[in-house]
């Protein structure tokens, strides 16, 4: 491998010692990562408005796939492409790749806001443009941390990456609030909100960011790139379809398609590992995983992201589909209020993230990352004890603890990972770090939705049947509705949607006593009915998330002491890899 000067090599000495440049790099990359993170979650809570806007019934056969791909397509693309785009940053310039990502993301946002189609065509257009957004987001995620690591001295990287990491995680929570607010005005604003930010950020990035690193003249490892990308994509797509019904099963984990996708993906990743150990210039240097801080940090990141993603989705479902309607909120208003009621989670992260990043520069990452995951585990365990109809201050306390735990963990963990690798590997390392975080978010959807569906499947059918018959619905109609797949009930709750008005035939509703018909189609009946089965799944979900947080804490504790590759003597570097 040959090292060659980057396109702006002459500027490096001036920029590197310009005290203002590092803050320019931090502010722009933080804006880019914040924008990309917001768009990863903003559609979750705005899906009812989006489906209404394109005139598509979310409970119609086939709509589940559109619903999943509208918010999963973006996450899948960013998870799959970040390592490749980090490699491109090492090869052609991190700033160049980052700037291109800002531009692509902005174009995707414009095309989403201008969606010209309705119905199925509209859903397919949104999915395609979300994938375009995801490509831009992958460039941003893959190169932002490497740009900051180049710009900041080692004693300030924890603070810089902490602020950047706060933007990445807080953006997921801010997206929920923004989606709920904008959806009440116009569904297109959910996508348009990124356009002015993207335009300003793109122009700013092209004018002010400069390459500080040297580029590496490396041959493209095509087979490694293909096997990794296709293998990871296959697994994540398989997980996406695994939560949909298959035949008489409530989930699709026994489907030949799902098994083939996941099995084929695992095989391709095994081939990827075999290839990378044999090519002269690998797509990703697997020896980085011999660095204890890098390996332990990424394992902890995967587990933390999985638990955090599960928390976001399950709390949204809990609030939007059950708690808010029962407490008098109209279905039209539940997206906004669900975002508002989740603010303690965001507040905890915003408080702890920068502070832990700053302190980790002095004391190392292990104490803060380990303590943060233990605090998150306490929050998850506390959530298992909440009744379905909880007192909000209690929920707010546990959300605050979860946010504080995530904030304590994320910033020091990110800095420790990036500090542990050589300078010429920062792009690929940043990409791999993003893979673990983004893949964890996707895995959380498949894992926790499946656990919720399993919890619902045990008693949902009998509960629905008993509730309908008790309100004078004919036995044959009640029997038919009681076979509603658990995933449909879950998505109805996620969308803040009362399915009874569309599930009960018009002639049946007309024949019922007016008071009974009003109860069945009112905002209390469906949420109250499914709250018992929902709680069964809820306890399982939070216990699993608590277990993941504890394992992440163990991985964090085993990462070793403070270690910076650029400052470590040769002996220390060798010891750190064993």
Predicted feature descriptions by range:
Residues 115-120, 187, 208-211, 243-244, ...:
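Short helix-capping/hinge motifs at transmembrane helix termini and TM-loop junctions
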Residues 50-51, 88-89, 178-184, 239, ...:
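Interfacial helix-cap and linker-helix signal at transmembrane-aqueous boundaries
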């Amino acid at each position: 491998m040959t090292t060659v000067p980057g396109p702006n090599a002459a500027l490096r000495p001036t920029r590197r010692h310009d005290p203002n440049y590092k803050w320019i790099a931090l502010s722009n990359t933080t804006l880019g990562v914040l924008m990309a993170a917001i768009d990863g979650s903003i559609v979750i809570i705005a899906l009812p408005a989006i489906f209404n806007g394109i005139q598509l019934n979310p409970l119609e056969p086939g709509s589940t796939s559109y619903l999943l791909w509208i918010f999963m397509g973006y996450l899948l693309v960013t998870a799959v492409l970040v390592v490749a785009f980090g490699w491109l940053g090492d090869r052609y310039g991190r700033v160049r790749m980052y700037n291109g990502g800002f531009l692509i993301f902005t174009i995707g946002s414009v095309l989403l806001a201008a969606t010209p189609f309705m119905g199925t065509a509209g859903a397919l257009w949104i999915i395609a443009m979300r994938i375009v957004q995801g490509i831009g987001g992958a460039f941003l995620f893959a190169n932002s941390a490497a740009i900051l690591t180049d710009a900041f001295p080692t004693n300030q990287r924890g603070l810089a990456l902490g602020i950047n990491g706060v933007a990445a995680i807080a953006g997921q929570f801010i997206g929920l609030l923004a989606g709920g607010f904008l959806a009440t005005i116009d569904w297109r604003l959910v996508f348009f909100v990124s356009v002015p930010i993207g335009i300003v950020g793109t122009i700013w990035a092209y004018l002010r960011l400069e390459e500080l690193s040297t580029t590496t003249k490396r041959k493209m490892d095509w087979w490694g790139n293909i096997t990794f990308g296709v293998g990871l994509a296959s697994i994540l797509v398989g997980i996406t379809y695994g939560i949909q019904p298959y035949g008489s099963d409530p989930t699709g984990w026994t489907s030949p398609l799902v098994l083939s996708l996941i099995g084929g993906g695992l095989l391709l990743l095994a081939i990827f590992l075999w290839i990378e150990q044999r090519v002269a210039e690998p797509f990703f240097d697997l020896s980085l995983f011999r660095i204890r801080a890098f390996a332990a940090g990424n394992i902890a990141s995967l587990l933390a992201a999985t638990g955090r993603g599960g928390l976001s989705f399950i709390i949204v479902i809990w609030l939007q589909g059950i708690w808010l309607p029962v407490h008098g909120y109209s279905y039209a208003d539940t997206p906004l209020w669900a975002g508002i009621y989740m603010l303690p989670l965001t507040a905890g992260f915003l408080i702890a993230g920068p502070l832990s990043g700053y302190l980790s520069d002095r004391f190392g990452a292990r104490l803060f990352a380990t303590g943060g995951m233990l605090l998150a585990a306490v929050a998850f365990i506390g959530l298992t004890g909440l009744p379905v109809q909880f007192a909000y201050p209690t929920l707010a306390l546990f959300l605050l603890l979860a946010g504080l735990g995530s904030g304590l963990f994320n910033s020091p963990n990110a800095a420790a990972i990036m500090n542990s690798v050589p300078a010429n590997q920062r792009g690929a390392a940043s990409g791999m770090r993003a893979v673990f975080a983004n893949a964890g978010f996707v895995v959380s959807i498949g894992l926790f939705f499946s656990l919720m569906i399993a919890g619902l499947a045990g008693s949902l059918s009998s509960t629905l049947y008993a509730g309908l018959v008790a309100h004078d619905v004919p036995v044959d109609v009640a029997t038919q509705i009681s076979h509603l797949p658990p995933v449909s009930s879950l998505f109805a709750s996620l969308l803040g949607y009362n399915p009874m008005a569309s599930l009960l035939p018009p002639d049946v509703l007309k024949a019922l006593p007016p008071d009974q018909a009003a109860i069945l189609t009112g905002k209390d009946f469906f949420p109250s009915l499914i709250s018992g089965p929902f709680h069964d799944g809820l306890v399982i979900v939070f216990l699993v998330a608590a277990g993941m947080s504890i394992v992440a804490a163990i991985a964090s504790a085993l990462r070793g002491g403070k270690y910076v590759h650029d400052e470590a003597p040769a002996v220390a570097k060798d010891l750190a890899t064993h």
